[in-house]
Amino acid sequence: MTPRTITVDTVRFGNHLPMTLIAGPCVIEGLEFALRTAEALKQICEGVGVELVYKSSFDKANRTSEGSFRGPGMEAGLRILERVRREVGVPVITDVHEADQCVAVAEVVDMLQTPAFLCRQTDFIQAAARPGKPVNIKKGQFLAPQDMARVAAKAAATGNENILLCERGFSFGYQNLVVDMRGLSIMAQSGYPVIFDATHSVQQPGALGGASGGDRRFVSDLARAAVAVGVAGVFMEVHPDPDHAPCDGPNMLPMAHLSPLLDQLKALDRIRKEAMALESGLSLGDA
């Protein structure tokens, strides 16, 4: 199928286009922290020459324990994301967890994201798509990649075809995820842009007892492999000090490691997209 181009503010996503980065800390930790991390990420991406969509969550509704840090909540979180968008000048994405959040969130952000655990919930997926903003639909850790075409069809039935499909690992026994890179190519057959979540793919759900663990040593390896297969973008949660982050620290990438990794990913992406262009007859960057 001909690859689609999805525009998020001024940023274009397409499996045939230069890769885009979706990045930011797991959860909103306050206004100043959000502005500071967004500005730092913007400068890194501008230096490398990669487009950025800033990501952070106002609520982590699927934490391992009742007492786990969840974030500032929707109202306060959206105010912060609006400030980031306006003052830093980057498009923003955040996740929704309930159908009745979608309209309010879509009024502030440039793209919505749906959690992997909820990808089979038809009413929820359609509620996320109905406002018309682009939606990054995460594939469930239990779902075959070919099944994501039907998930996308549910969203598109609302009239919104601004859909991206995101791989974030597959459950492999208890408290472990693996990535089958074939799934990226299988999902790309839908025509929708495919995003690879390099940090949640190294998560170890519930492995720390009251919290999820992870192994960030493998983030770079998986990101390079995914880009070599060919994706529209890479999703990475990035933090200046992940060992002291309130959630998902073990699988977040230290911000100091981002620039050299992006240099590598950009080079790999260029090689892969040039090959794809030759195979399809498109010029790199064509819509």
From Swiss-Prot:
<dbReference type="GO" id="GO:0005737">
    <property type="term" value="C:cytoplasm"/>
</dbReference>
<dbReference type="InterPro" id="IPR006269">
    <property type="entry name" value="KDO8P_synthase"/>
</dbReference>
<protein>
    <recommendedName>
        <fullName>2-dehydro-3-deoxyphosphooctonate aldolase</fullName>
        <ecNumber>2.5.1.55</ecNumber>
    </recommendedName>
</protein>
<dbReference type="Pfam" id="PF00793">
    <property type="entry name" value="DAHP_synth_1"/>
</dbReference>
<dbReference type="GO" id="GO:0008676">
    <property type="term" value="F:3-deoxy-8-phosphooctulonate synthase activity"/>
</dbReference>
<dbReference type="GO" id="GO:0019294">
    <property type="term" value="P:keto-3-deoxy-D-manno-octulosonic acid biosynthetic process"/>
</dbReference>
<dbReference type="InterPro" id="IPR013785">
    <property type="entry name" value="Aldolase_TIM"/>
</dbReference>
<keyword id="KW-0963">Cytoplasm</keyword>
<keyword id="KW-0448">Lipopolysaccharide biosynthesis</keyword>
<comment type="similarity">
    <text>Belongs to the KdsA family.</text>
</comment>
<dbReference type="InterPro" id="IPR006218">
    <property type="entry name" value="DAHP1/KDSA"/>
</dbReference>
<comment type="pathway">
    <text>Bacterial outer membrane biogenesis; lipopolysaccharide biosynthesis.</text>
</comment>
<keyword id="KW-0808">Transferase</keyword>
<comment type="pathway">
    <text>Carbohydrate biosynthesis; 3-deoxy-D-manno-octulosonate biosynthesis; 3-deoxy-D-manno-octulosonate from D-ribulose 5-phosphate: step 2/3.</text>
</comment>
